[in-house]
From Swiss-Prot:
Biased segments, Basic and acidic residues type: 22-35
Protein name: Zinc finger protein 346
Low complexity bias: start-end ranges: 1-19
Region (Disordered), start-end ranges: 1-35, 269-294
SMART domains attached to this UniProt entry: ZnF_C2H2, ZnF_U1
Gene Ontology CC: cytoplasm; nucleolus; nucleus
Record remark: domains: The zinc-finger domains are required for binding to dsRNA, and also for nuclear localization.
Length: 294
């Protein structure tokens, strides 16, 4: 469709796109000579799905990717003539243009894109099956047909390679377990791994490990060594009291809490005397079960 240049009376104000002479082209109709294929739908969707173009470079990039619809002098979607550089920039950055492009895409492009998305999902599922019928990554073999592939997967060669791979995986897991038991490679207290003994020694002399050791000794002193939450809690994450369901931020806070009246009256517990270290069972006094941090 050829669109005449605007008359002097039709020229737009600065910053506005000049309209075609006459009414705008109906939105449901594609511009003449434009075939709306999948690739064009994708490019146009990318152009309007994000933020509006800001600045000359983004506008030029949008025009370059969608030359079938946008040029420096004409917007076929809005049926507008752009008679100056300022009008071109103002038009392509306007909300009115963006809204018309979205409506245009909804009419001509969304069905195309939706169809592509559905096909992509089914294609991905079928491609895995096709890949399996084309090659075996375990045995590093390729097949000329699905029948040859099926014969391979049922054969002794594939079964042997699969068994070796499984054994290798198990061996790697056992090696990892052995490394976790080696203090020069893994610290079970801090859940840290080391590449060499020097790195391990540096860790064991560091503040983080010492803090975890102090935490563990403190819990043991107050009869909390059997609490799994203590050893599972990462270093630097506080000092938990499962009885009161709170976490203290420092050793001093924890000591003050477990020595306090509120903690002692939550449930029966063991008090350790400083002289004999003999545990003595005490019974709680009647108290509200609500938990309040000291």
């Amino acid at each position: 469709m050829e669109c005449p240049a605007p008359d002097a009376t039709d020229a737009a104000d600065p910053g506005e796109a000049g309209p075609y002479k006459g009414s705008e082209e109906p939105e449901g109709r594609e511009p003449d000579g434009v075939r709306f294929d999948r690739e064009r739908a994708r490019r146009l969707w990318e152009a309007v799905s994000g933020a509006q173009p800001a600045g000359r470079e983004e506008v030029e990039h949008m025009i370059q990717k969608n030359q079938c619809l946008f040029t420096s002098t004409q917007c076929k979607v809005c049926c507008a003539m752009l008679i100056s550089e300022s009008q071109k920039l103002a038009h392509y950055q306007s909300k009115k243009h963006a809204n018309k492009v979205k409506r245009y895409l909804a009419i001509h492009g969304m069905e195309t894109i939706k169809g592509d998305v559905k096909r992509l999902d089914s294609d991905q599922k079928s491609s895995r099956s096709k890949d399996k019928n084309h090659c075996c990554p375990i045995c590093n073999m390729t097949f000329s047909s699905p029948a040859v592939a099926q014969s391979h997967y049922l054969g002794k060669t594939h079964a042997k390679s699969l068994k070796l791979k499984q054994q290798s995986t198990k061996g790697a897991a056992l090696q990892q377990n052995r490394e976790m038991l080696d203090p020069d490679k893994f610290c079970s207290l801090c859940h840290s791994t080391f590449n060499d003994p020097a790195m391990a020694q540096q860790h064991y002399m560091g503040k983080r490990h010492r803090k975890q050791e102090t935490k563990l000794k403190l819990m043991a002193h107050y009869g909390r060594l059997a609490d799994p939450a203590v050893s599972d809690l990462p270093a630097g994450k506080g000092y938990p009291c499962k009885t009161c369901k709170i976490v203290l931020n420092s050793i001093e806070q924890y000591q003050a809490h477990v020595s306090g009246f509120k903690h002692k009256n939550q449930s029966p517990k063991t008090l350790v005397t400083l002289g004999s270290q003999t545990p003595v069972q005490t019974q709680p006094t009647p108290k509200d079960s609500s938990t309040v941090q000291d």
